[in-house]
Amino acid sequence: MPELPEVETVRRTLTGLVKGKTIKSVEIRWPNIIKRPAEPEEFARKLAGETIQSIGRRGKFLLFHLDHYVMVSHLRMEGKYGLHQAEEPDDKHVHVIFTMTDGTQLRYRDVRKFGTMHLFKPGEEAGELPLSQLGPEPDAEEFTSAYLKDRLAKTNRAVKTALLDQKTVVGLGNIYVDEALFRAGVHPETKANQLSDKTIKTLHAEIKNTLQEAIDAGGSTVRSYINSQGEIGMFQLQHFVYGKKDEPCKNCGTMISKIVVGGRGTHFCAKCQTKK
C-alpha cells in the first residue's frame, strides 16, 4: 500500500498534470469504488463541469479540490492515476475515467479494486469518515515528541502496531514504521508504554527524518508503485531493514530478521534493536 511519501509524490506529480483542467465527463466502470454519494451516477453528474483547483493530501488520502466539491481518494494497495490522450488504449484494470474538456483523460487504474472515492462539499470532509478520525500529520506542529509520548503511554500494544494506527499519526505503514524503528534502535515488539522519554524523542525525530528523506527520493518502489508520470521511487535503495530479510545489517552485519507483529510482516535487526 502506498504510504505517505508515495502519496505525496503522486500528489505533486499529479498536480503538475491536471491542475486547472476541467472535467467534461466521468465514466465509472467499477461502481464499488465510489463510496459517496451512494449512487455512482450522482458522483459523475456532480463532477461534470468542475475544474481541478488543487490537489491536497491528508495522510494516505488524496484530496482533489474542485470548484464546488472535494474528492477524497484512497489508492489502497494498487491504485494509480495517470493522464492519457483519449485515443490511447486502456485495459480491464482502468475503473474510472475523468475526461477533460481539452480531450485528455485522467484514468484511475487499480488491479486489486480496493481504492475508494468520496465526494464532499468543501469543509465537510474533515468531519466525516474516512478523514474524521485521523491523527496529526508528521510535519504538523502538534506532532511533537510530547504528543507522541502521551499517545504511546496510553497503550500496551507493540510499538509497531501503535505506530501503524492512523489515529496516532497519519501516513505510516509497514515500510516506514520498520525503517524508523530501526533508526531509533527500537525493537518492534517493545510495548509502546514502556519506551523511555529519551527513546521517544529519538523515535519522533526518526519518523520525521525517514518520511522526509523518502519524499525527497520519490517514495519506495518495492512492488508496483509508480508516480503519476510513470516513474518509480528510489528510497528503496536507502532501506536499512524493510525487504532485507537474511541480508546483513548495514550497521553491524547481523542478518536482518522478519517476524509477524500485529499480523504484519516486520523487518528488524536483532542486534541493533534489542527487545526490552
Swiss-Prot record:
Its needed co-factors are: Zn(2+)
Keywords recorded for this protein, A-Z? DNA damage, DNA repair, DNA-binding, Glycosidase, Hydrolase, Lyase, Metal-binding, Multifunctional enzyme, Zinc, Zinc-finger
Check the record and name the InterPro entries matching this protein: DNA_glyclase/AP_lyase_DNA-bd, DNA_glyclase_Znf_dom_DNA_BS, Formamido-pyr_DNA_Glyclase, FPG_cat, MutM-like_N-ter, Ribosomal_uS13-like_H2TH, Znf_DNA_glyclase/AP_lyase, Znf_FPG/IleRS
Q: Phenotype of the disruptant?
A: Cells lacking this gene have a 5-fold increased spontaneous mutation frequency. A double mutM/mutY mutant has a 1000-fold increased spontaneous mutation frequency. Triple ytkD/mutM/mutY disrupted strains show increased mutation rates during both exponential and stationary phase.
According to its UniProt record, which reaction does this protein catalyse?
A: Hydrolysis of DNA containing ring-opened 7-methylguanine residues, releasing 2,6-diamino-4-hydroxy-5-(N-methyl)formamidopyrimidine; 2'-deoxyribonucleotide-(2'-deoxyribose 5'-phosphate)-2'-deoxyribonucleotide-DNA = a 3'-end 2'-deoxyribonucleotide-(2,3-dehydro-2,3-deoxyribose 5'-phosphate)-DNA + a 5'-end 5'-phospho-2'-deoxyribonucleoside-DNA + H(+)
Name the catalytic site residues.
Answer: P2, E3, K60, R264
Q: What is its EC number?
A: 3.2.2.23, 4.2.99.18
Q: What Pfam families has UniProt attached to this entry?
A: Fapy_DNA_glyco, H2TH, zf-FPG_IleRS
Q: How is the cofactor bound?
A: Binds 1 zinc ion per subunit.
Q: How does it assemble?
A: Monomer.
Q: What does this protein do?
A: Involved in the GO system responsible for removing an oxidatively damaged form of guanine (7,8-dihydro-8-oxoguanine, 8-oxo-dGTP) from DNA and the nucleotide pool. 8-oxo-dGTP is inserted opposite dA and dC residues of template DNA with almost equal efficiency thus leading to A.T to G.C transversions. Involved in base excision repair of DNA damaged by oxidation or by mutagenic agents. Acts as a DNA glycosylase that recognizes and removes damaged bases. Has a preference for oxidized purines, such as 8-oxo-dGTP. Has AP (apurinic/apyrimidinic) lyase activity and introduces nicks in the DNA strand.
The family this protein is said to belong to: Belongs to the FPG family.
Write down what this protein is called: Formamidopyrimidine-DNA glycosylase
Q: Which organism is it from?
A: Bacillus subtilis (strain 168)
Gene behind this chain?
Answer: mutM
